[in-house]
Amino acid sequence: MADISRAALFGKLNKTTYRGIESATAFCRLRGDREVDLLHWLHQLLQAQDGDLHRIVRHFSLDAARLAQDLTAALDRLPRGGGGHFDLSASVEEAVERAWVHCTLRYGRQRIRGGDLLVAILHTRSLRNGLLAMSSEFGKLRAEALADDLDAIVAGSPEDDATDIAAASAPAGPTAAGGTAALALYTVDLTAQAREGKLDPII
């Protein structure tokens, strides 16, 4: 799948996961990290008020406070200063590719939600190893149980909302959750926007 453009690939994200990667990108730049990692993305998704990941955390009885502490510690271990170079990590692109496979072939969906992303990570050895390195709490997740019961586990999530999946039937364009706007995400100077006060504060 290496020949698939980023615009096409990231255009498959639903509103929640797309906004999550936007926030992760801004967060990464403001921290001065070298690349946008899965760690940034998961951290930002969990910073939201609710979503698939929150319901999965509760279902498998992860310690949310310890998880948050572990993710913060993992962020602090990341190398800083890319010397002007800034990009997505290979793990982010691989996670989206694998999530798209699970999303379409396993669940018959047109947009990747947070649960699809986590299922894909858990079923890809290298990505799973990276997840466990972020926090031992992720070791409580059972890959097959999550994959088999995902829809029931995340039932009621804001990602069920029609507005979160509306992009699936919308024409590709700058106002859709995906489409060509996905490519623009990596060409906008978010650091400059932050300096000019055009970005909302990210916690």
Positions of PLM-derived features:
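Histone-fold recognition with a strong bias for associated Lys/Arg-rich disordered tails
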Residues: 1-203
